C-alpha cells in the first residue's frame, strides 16, 4: 500500500480508496438495519440503531 492510498482492503474500500459515505456495506437482516460506509474508513461500522 502506497502512502497516498487510504486503504487496501475492506468492505468500504474500492480501488484503494474509501467508498463514499452512505454506501451500504452490510445489508439488513431480520430486525437489523443496513450498515453504511462513513467515507473515512475501510471498515463497515455497525448501525447504532441495531442495538
UniProtKB/Swiss-Prot annotation:
UniProt GO molecular function: toxin activity
Domain of life: Eukaryota
Residues recorded as bearing Pyrrolidone carboxylic acid in the entry: 1
Xref: SMART domains: DISIN
Keywords: Cell adhesion impairing toxin, Disulfide bond, Hemostasis impairing toxin, Platelet aggregation inhibiting toxin, Pyrrolidone carboxylic acid, Secreted, Toxin
Chain ranges of the Disintegrin domain: 1-51
Subcellular location: Secreted
Keyword Secreted assigned: yes
Bridged cysteine pairs (disulfide): 7-16, 12-37, 13-42, 25-44
Sequence motif: Cell attachment site, positions: 29-31
SUPFAM superfamilies xref list: Blood coagulation inhibitor (disintegrin)
Gene Ontology cellular component annotations, sorted alphabetically: extracellular region
Protein family (similarity comment): Belongs to the venom metalloproteinase (M12B) family. P-II subfamily. P-IIa sub-subfamily.
Role: Inhibits fibrinogen interaction with platelets. Acts by binding to alpha-IIb/beta-3 (ITGA2B/ITGB3) on the platelet surface and inhibits aggregation induced by ADP, thrombin, platelet-activating factor and collagen.
Extra information: The disintegrin belongs to the short disintegrin subfamily.
Subunit relationships: Monomer (disintegrin).
Protein's recorded name: Disintegrin eristicophin
